Each structure stands twice: as structure tokens, then as C-alpha cells.
Amino acid sequence: MKKLIISCCLLATFSAAGAWADAAGDLQQRLDKVKSFHATFSQKVTDGSGTSVQDGEGEMWVQRPNLFNWHMITPDESILISDGKTLWFYNPFVEQASASLLKDATSNTPFMLIARNQASDWKQYHVAQKGDDFSLTPKSADGNLKQFTINVAQNGTINQFSAVEQDGQRSNYALKSQQSGPISADKFKFRPPKGVTVDDQRQ
């Protein structure tokens, strides 16, 4: 009887691991169908009790695996750009920019996961699938991300994604007007405007 229970437990473990692997593989394959795209998005942030904290809008350009431009327009403008090697973050209001190596960037943020779509990133999560909805839970509890969900159609179109932090704060992003196709290389270049203070962390 004891051997039977152990066997059943092992089978359940292997079955769950297989399901996670299949879900992660399906998610990566779907995202791979669209190599580059532009979309506008709306953002809604709520705290742990569900109270609205912030509403915002912006647009994004992605050219996988390592080129992206995330432009938050409202309520406070900010820009996150990767040229494939350097990750730039620019805050126009305070006239400050930071530069870090992309290879050192954390994969513990939803946008980085979507933009890079690298198998090594997905392996850090337990991935569950229900239709077009994918739920990701970090295998390590060290980061601030508690759960990440994303809705991706079979053709690779991302409809929405959300992130829940350890304190219960939830950020929802709904994508609109998504268009796939070539993107100008200029979208992935950043040159700090005159007068901007730069914190260079690449060394």
C-alpha cells in the first residue's frame, strides 16, 4: 500500500512537471510567431484591497529577442529602451537617465519576459495554461513578483497581461491596435538629451 501511494505521488509529480513544460513550450511558440510588433496599451494598478491606485496609457515596440521600446505616456512619462546590449531608462520630468547592461537585467518583470521570450527565463517559472490564458508563478520567492498572467492568441497576438506583487498590488495591461511587421531601427536607439544626468551602470 505504501509503495502504491509513493508511486501515485511520483506519477502526479511527473505529470505536473510535464504539464508545466508543455504550457511553457506552447507559450514560447505562440510568442515566437510574432517577431516584431507595435501596440498601444492601457494600464490599471490596484492595491491589495482592489482600490484603484493609478490609471495610465502608453505604447510599446518589440523586436525579439532583445530590442524593445516601452513608452509610458500618462500619468507620468517614462521610457525604457533596449538596443540589444544596453538597457536605458529615461525620466523626462526629472531629466535623468540610467544605462545598464541588458544581460544583467532581471527577468522578474512581465515586460522583460514578453520582450525577450527566452527559454532560460521561462524555466524560472511554473507555467499553467487554460486556453489562451497562461499563469506564471516564480519558482523562487526571492523577487517581488508573486504571479504573472498573460493572454496570448494562437497567432501570437498578446491581448493583455497582468502582474501581482508580493504585497498584493496588481498591474493590468490591455493591449490595443497591435500591428506586426518591421519597425524602424531608430525606435531602439537612445541618445540622452542635452542637460540630462546619466547614471551609467555598465561597468
Swiss-Prot record:
Residues 1-21 form the signal peptide. GO terms for biological process: lipoprotein localization to outer membrane; lipoprotein transport. Residues 174-203 are annotated as: Disordered. GO terms for cellular component: outer membrane-bounded periplasmic space. Keywords: Chaperone, Periplasm, Protein transport, Signal, Transport. It holds the Pfam family LolA. The keyword Signal applies. It is found in: Periplasm. It comes from the Bacteria. Transmembrane segments: none annotated. Belongs to the LolA family. NCBIfam families: lolA. Participates in the translocation of lipoproteins from the inner membrane to the outer membrane. Only forms a complex with a lipoprotein if the residue after the N-terminal Cys is not an aspartate (The Asp acts as a targeting signal to indicate that the lipoprotein should stay in the inner membrane). Monomer. This is Outer-membrane lipoprotein carrier protein. It comes from Erwinia tasmaniensis (strain DSM 17950 / CFBP 7177 / CIP 109463 / NCPPB 4357 / Et1/99). The gene is lolA.
